[in-house]
């Protein structure tokens, strides 16, 4: 039970910022364009 700290920080992948950047460089523009395209459907006269 002394290795309870290992659960909070996995030693196998200590660098999670590269994974965070890789996910958000794809997720943020995707959500932005989906929101922009969805909003265009309603502003047509």
Swiss-Prot record:
GO terms for cellular component: photosystem II reaction center; plasma membrane-derived thylakoid membrane. With its partner (PsbE) binds heme. PSII binds additional chlorophylls, carotenoids and specific lipids. The keyword Iron applies. It holds the Pfam family Cytochrom_B559. PROSITE patterns: CYTOCHROME_B559. Heme binds at residue 24. Belongs to the PsbE/PsbF family. Heterodimer of an alpha subunit and a beta subunit. PSII is composed of 1 copy each of membrane proteins PsbA, PsbB, PsbC, PsbD, PsbE, PsbF, PsbH, PsbI, PsbJ, PsbK, PsbL, PsbM, PsbT, PsbX, PsbY, PsbZ, Psb30/Ycf12, peripheral proteins PsbO, CyanoQ (PsbQ), PsbU, PsbV and a large number of cofactors. It forms dimeric complexes. This is Cytochrome b559 subunit beta. It comes from Nostoc sp. (strain PCC 7120 / SAG 25.82 / UTEX 2576).
């Amino acid at each position: 039970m002394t290795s309870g700290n290992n659960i909070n920080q996995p030693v196998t992948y200590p660098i999670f910022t590269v994974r965070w950047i890789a996910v958000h460089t794809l997720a943020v523009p995707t959500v932005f364009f989906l929101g922009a395209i969805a909003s265009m459907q309603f502003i047509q006269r």
